[in-house]
């Protein structure tokens, strides 16, 4: 076959996603909320095999309203290489290269990795060939009003070190030095190498694109830290020997469980 879902599977997907969206966001039926805040898998009968799970097929990025999120870093300009939105210092330790991507859709220029990057969202890129850590200082921020730590991450196409996918640790540290760690792959299926044929130029157009999907980690995963007085967050790339990722929208969010 052509690799596409059958008409019957496509219909089942549409029925679930369209109906549950309206029943939750318009009808207020709370039992559908967990699907739309990324906290549970879709029903197995929505999966192509009819049983599931199939979390790697349906990737949800939750971006709460402004009143329900605290932006740590939106990576909107080169200042994000040194300072986050809270005014805290940003540090890149051990990376072979890093920088900011300022693209504007087509022709996909403006990023030193994953060329072309068809995206209008500014983002950071980080490449490593030994253990490396991104650290963002939180200046004692109080996170008790939030439930989820989120960051949007794309596994960069064009880097053969990424072909088996990527993984990284997320570390929260409080002002007393207590640290707690969560493994990204325990909370997302999105860290895979972009599928498809490579895009070369306007006449040789493949479908391969780097897409930034949310990694949403409940704060309950970080046991033993004082959420009233957080010092820093770290993204530790020590699960694979090498790779490249693109990152944006590091935020704390309130979601409706």
Annotated model-derived regions:
Residues 1-137, 144-150, 245, 253-257:
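Alpha/beta-hydrolase-fold serine-hydrolase catalytic core, especially in secreted/extracellular enzymes
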Residues 126-224, 237-257:
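Extracellular ligand-binding interfaces
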Residues 227-236:
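Short, surface-exposed ligand- or partner-binding patches at beta-edge/loop junctions that are enriched
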Residues 28-32, 223-228:
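Substrate-binding/catalytic groove segments of enzymes
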Residues 4-5, 200, 233:
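A near-ubiquitous, low-amplitude feature marking generic local secondary-structure context
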């Amino acid at each position: 076959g052509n690799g596409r879902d059958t008409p019957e599977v496509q219909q089942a997907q549409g029925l679930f996603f369209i109906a549950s969206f309206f029943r939750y966001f318009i009808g207020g039926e709370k039992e559908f909320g967990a699907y739309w805040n990324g906290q549970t898998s879709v029903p197995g009968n929505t999966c192509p095999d009819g049983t599931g799970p199939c979390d790697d097929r349906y990737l949800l990025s939750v971006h709460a309203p402004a009143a329900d999120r605290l932006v740590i870093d939106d990576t909107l300009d080169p200042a994000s290489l040194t300072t986050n939105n809270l005014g805290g210092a940003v540090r890149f330790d051990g990376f072979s290269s890093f920088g900011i991507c300022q693209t504007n859709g087509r022709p996909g220029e403006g990023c030193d990795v994953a060329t072309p990057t068809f995206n209008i969202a500014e983002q950071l890129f980080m490449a490593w060939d030994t253990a490396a850590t991104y650290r963002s200082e939180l200046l004692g921020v109080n996170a008790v009003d939030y439930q989820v730590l989120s960051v949007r991450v794309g596994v960069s196409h064009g880097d053969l070190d990424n072909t088996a996918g990527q993984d990284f640790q997320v570390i929260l540290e409080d002002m007393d030095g207590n640290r707690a760690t969560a493994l990204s792959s325990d909370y997302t299926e999105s860290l895979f190498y972009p599928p498809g044929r490579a895009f070369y130029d306007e006449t040789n157009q493949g479908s391969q694109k780097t897409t930034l999907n949310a990694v949403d980690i409940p704060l309950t995963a970080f046991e033993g830290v004082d959420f009233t007085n957080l010092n820093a967050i770290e993204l530790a790339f020590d699960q694979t020997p090498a790779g490249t990722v693109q990152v944006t929208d590091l935020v704390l969010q309130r979601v409706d469980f």
